[in-house]
């Protein structure tokens, strides 16, 4: 397989030393995109508030919260991948300019093209009225396109600008020195929201400025880099797996307890228990060296960014059909999830046959 440069976590990645794909990272990336599609399927069929969920059967409510929480693991996995692949590299002045030109600018161009396509789609299918001024605001990244998944793109574009600087800084610092600020910032960024999820009336706030560390999402990248540097390598996989499940069940318990009290709590990425579960899960993926039916998984991994960009318009159209059908909600969720995955994969496969178009629309390099 031809060698490809390290790119965004959704992107095609190769091991620089062996010139082969890293199996564990392909597993992580493929699972991550499946989880992202799952959470979007849940959010677009269920109304995730206390009134609506508590009016449903216990089974349907538990199904919704489990799938929702599973889906929330997708974005952390992508961010860990970015940190794992991009922060443990040597950046010279020349390579920094190359990174900005090929990686950052390429991602920006792809994002802008999709913003235009999304706005045209929303108008063509009567989801919103056309507004040239609104399109301009969307393209300037001062307003989010009316598609729930697009919050991610401005965030990762902003983070990407500083990746070379962060990588160069980390190269000159021993791991034991990095631990203190990383642990301190993480305790505030993730710990306080986790505390408030258990005690909703707590007045606790995160007052320490985390901007220099990249905020919550920058910390995800740093922890991904820390896994690359051997975090958890001396801990048995069974222990890590048990802790992964325990933290995930803790998040579920908090959500279910909140809904039982009539309070809607839908976990976000700043929750320490969710972040910890995702980090441990990622460290397990990294240990995978081979797997069954790797060709299909490899294709899904390589095209995960394209699927991410393509899936939401398909989801919006298929959702309209499913909403009027008298089927159980869990069945609708599974159908929506699989149908969106299928349509997105087919569109990716077609676009992939036109390399220049794929370069722009799918960010293929």
Regions flagged by a language model, labelled:
Residues 2-8, 15, 289-301, 312-365:
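C-terminal "closing" transmembrane helix and its immediate cytosolic amphipathic cap
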Residues 80, 84-88, 159, 163-167, ...:
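Hydrophobic transmembrane alpha-helices
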Residues 214-215, 232-298, 329-331:
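Alpha-helical transmembrane segments and terminal signal-anchor/GPI-anchor hydrophobic tails
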Residues 60, 68-77, 88-123, 127-145, ...:
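Transmembrane alpha-helical segments and their boundary/interface "anchor" motifs
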Residues 160-187, 225-245:
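Solvent-exposed interhelical
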Residues 63-75, 140-155, 193-220, 254-280:
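Interfacial loop-to-helix transition and helix-capping segments at the boundaries
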Residues 23-88, 108-111, 115:
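Functionally critical transmembrane alpha-helices in membrane proteins and complexes, commonly lining
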Residues 34, 38-41, 115-116, 182-196, ...:
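Aromatic-anchored segments of alpha-helical transmembrane domains
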